[in-house]
Amino acid sequence: MKTTKFNIENLDLFYGENQALKSINLPIPTRQVTALIGPSGCGKSTLLRCLNRMNDLIEGVTITGKLTMDGQDVYGNIDVSDLRIRVGMVFQKPNPFPMSIYENVAYGLRAQGIKDKKHLDEVVERSLRGAALWDEVKDRLKSHAFGLSGGQQQRLCIARTIAMEPDVILMDEPTSALDPIATHKIEELMEDLKKNYTIVIVTHSMQQARRISDRTAFFLMGELVEHDDTQVIFSNPRDDRTRGYVNGDFG
């Protein structure tokens, strides 16, 4: 396995009295796609949100155990805003801001006080190219982002994320609201993005996990049942529960 970006050790998470994650131990490799799979409510999205401390925003959450990124304690004395720049997130439904295509991508930089137009122009173009969207929008950058198709909006959100130069991109079912053609474009994009970023994706699609991920982790009722190379998980899993899930015996 490649070098480890995240290392998760004995992680427990509670929503009040309800335990959502149970003693999770999982290494996440650098510059690969790691897919988190399992039935609804199994804890995969909860774990994803631990990686950039989005769960901090939920009242009553308690987390124990250890989670490090490049050896640094994610739940230690760190700047959470900086963490969420380094660990960007793309959500299930495209969520462009109510502004132009250009300003969507430039938004984070402007929020950091960057005003130099040449620099902004360069980052916007580079980010849109990185999200495989530049050729489709380069002649209408001042147009409202809501005029884009759903698939284009999701790639715009990816461009907005990579404009901040993160180390990691988290994706929470990023294609579930998209048609097959748009889904295919996002999947192709992930293959290219992993050359520069560590990607962790939650998906309900077994076919998608098999197509796009290098590693797969299977969750069930808050437990990590097993994790391995994706080919192993789908062809020769160690646990009968994993075999049953990937074969469609339950969902």
Swiss-Prot record:
Single GO MF descriptor: ATPase-coupled phosphate ion transmembrane transporter activity
- Oligomeric form and interacting partners: The complex is composed of two ATP-binding proteins (PstB), two transmembrane proteins (PstC and PstA) and a solute-binding protein (PstS).
Organism of origin is: Vibrio cholerae serotype O1 (strain ATCC 39315 / El Tor Inaba N16961)
Q: Where is the ABC transporter domain?
A: 6-246
Q: Which GO terms describe its cellular component?
A: plasma membrane
Q: Does the keyword Iron apply?
A: no
Gene Ontology terms: biological process: phosphate ion transmembrane transport
Similarity comment text for this entry: Belongs to the ABC transporter superfamily. Phosphate importer (TC 3.A.1.7) family.
Q: Which InterPro entries match?
A: AAA+_ATPase, ABC_transporter-like_ATP-bd, ABC_transporter-like_CS, P-loop_NTPase, PstB-like
Q: Which UniProt keywords apply?
A: ATP-binding, Cell inner membrane, Cell membrane, Membrane, Nucleotide-binding, Phosphate transport, Translocase, Transport
Enzyme Commission designation: 7.3.2.1
**NCBIfam families in the record:** 3a0107s01c2 (TIGR00972)
- Positions binding ATP in this chain are 38-45
Q: What is this protein called?
A: Phosphate import ATP-binding protein PstB 2
Q: What does this protein do?
A: Part of the ABC transporter complex PstSACB involved in phosphate import. Responsible for energy coupling to the transport system.
Q: How does the record classify its membrane topology?
A: Peripheral membrane protein
User: Where is the protein found, in the record's own terms?
Assistant: Cell inner membrane
For this protein, the record's Pfam families field holds: ABC_tran
**Reactions it catalyzes:** phosphate(out) + ATP + H2O = ADP + 2 phosphate(in) + H(+)
